[in-house]
């Protein structure tokens, strides 16, 4: 539990930096929330149930039928501050078939990564929660999602 408290403190610090002296509202945030999912994915099902259980209103987007564009991925990656490889579904068959790890290790640029990710939603780590255009850690991390949503 101590790690969760620490993570919550970090997220609150980031929010303070983003919002300056504006107070951070307590309780669930009211925002434009986009939930990118692959409906057959068990982690996506768990994340969806968690959001619904918390009473969070969100829009959904099928990550394969309407996969993210290179431009969206670039914006989300930049806003996240995470390494681009965190946006790849490293456990997926397509990731292994295309030997993406070797390409990343060989120095694939961020722009090349965005283009590759945009070719097929199955390459993208899911679920992906986007709040007001800014992503939360790719994949379902309850502590990070709770902190970002002020829960």
Task: Specify the residue positions occupied by each region the protein language model found.
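Extreme N-terminal basic, low-complexity initiation segments
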Residues: 2-9
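Local sequence-structure signature of Cys/Sec-based thiol-disulfide redox active-site neighborhoods
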Residues: 31-49, 61
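Class I S-adenosyl-L-methionine
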Residues: 45-48, 52, 96, 146
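A short beta-strand-loop structural module common to alpha/beta enzyme folds
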Residues: 57-67
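Thiol/selenol-based redox catalytic cores and closely related redox-interacting motifs
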Residues: 65-151
